[in-house]
């Protein structure tokens, strides 16, 4: 009987392992939660020294590292009795449990990536995958054998699955710490009260979003994250809005920024870079397969989960619907990574992502982007015409891959053909990569982050995590007009026609913009409303149980020649309609149409724009040699620091 269950689980896991197939049809209609408990473990072979054993559990990128238990040689079966709760969004969810063991007498001395990038101090014992079809039963209580181990190790697992019709709102979260800051708001580390899971809540100020003409980018990110799921792309759990802010609750990816990890070593070995680049290729290839150009690939947009796998974040600059043979002209991205055709304004397609991949790969193995300069004017010239040079330690296969990706002719660039990412996979540099195992996270990462607890933010920028407080959406007051609010219609998940104002009262919207995702009664009478008035310093000190995972940073207002000056457009409109400027009244954002953002006119194709790029001043993100501030200071008002 046990063997049949084991074979059934393996078959089901193989059937559903391609998690990239998630779409709207797979999203559950109601909120669901899975409670699981690891009761005990048996079958471990212990030599002389006692070992410590812990479990990494994950579901939909929610991650938990259990406490460690010490096991001695004479113990054949060990009681564990530790349980957690996950939020379940999709019918294709898989509960993944991996058991790790290490010497109980060894303490991890540091978190840096040593040598070729491997500093894992624990050994994988085995894994267990429990698919949705199994745990959706109300209760499950049985022993499961672990896979991927030569030992006959089994764990006793109990699960309980529940559904709820309750809508998620701001009141369901405790605000703990600010972990990222951008042009339109900030990203907060939050704790979901009922499950204890950690998430990254992106709080976007509506007025700034309107002022910077970024409503379309915000809706694009929400739409793509809601529509698709991929193992190496951050997931959207919930979205809702208040009178003055938009909120997206995203996976918290606790291993921190890849930028941080490469800064610790200056470079990665080619073997380590191959692992990360391979996972990035799978994510970008998935987007291309669905007609999406990413357009902002860089180290800062790559996070590491607790297992050491990569997660792509910030889809705000993605471009949808570009058909084969067609191009787009909007200039956007980050200056070190933009392709020549973007700078020249000749039009570009999906191959700009492969140029950025080549730049990123070069940066991983050489330490800086290939055409980097402290002078942005000089850097654009280097991107357009400078010969590509390699340090002596770069292998021939690596140099060949970079050269093919950094071909200035986009039609001849590796990956520009109809087969897209498959062209790059076939390069000799990836000869020994098992792409199926890499996609299913069955390849051991070169480095596994070690955290001392769920609030360990060691791998994030301390300028954000230590010196700033989280922002509660209810504290934002922008006094937007009804016309302004129309731009945000449809942002919330299945929200009723209400939203909460700053006084915690319920306001009915005649524009049907969608609300915070709560009805008026539950919002007004919520026992957690008092948390809005709790000082952030006190909230951040609240004791919490069990979750660790990672985070997603907000995108800055990237440079773009199509960005409009709000005041100029207002004056033009007033002149056309012969209206005097209103006195002491909020200026209207007239370019926001009173309809769904999908109907906002698309920007026209731009003529060559090298001169416009050179007129823009950029601040280099944190580099290996200069302690510069991150890109998030690029568009921030100095008074808001």
Curated annotation (Swiss-Prot):
Domain AGC-kinase C-terminal residues, every copy: 431-503
Segments crossing the lipid bilayer: none
Catalytic residue positions: 296
Ranges of Low complexity composition bias in the record: 537-546, 567-578
Domain C2: 13-144
Residues engaged in binding ATP: 179-187, 202
Keyword ATP-binding applies: yes
Keyword terms: ATP-binding, Kinase, Nucleotide-binding, Phosphoprotein, Serine/threonine-protein kinase, Transferase
InterPro entries to which the protein is assigned, alphabetical: AGC-kinase_C, C2_dom, C2_domain_sf, Kinase-like_dom_sf, Pkinase_C, Prot_kinase_dom, Protein_kinase_ATP_BS, Ser/Thr_kinase_AS
Extent of Polar residues compositional bias: 523-536
Keyword Nucleotide-binding: yes
Any one GO BP annotation for this protein: intracellular signal transduction
Family of this protein: Belongs to the protein kinase superfamily. AGC Ser/Thr protein kinase family.
Name of this chain's protein: Probable serine/threonine-protein kinase DDB_G0288795
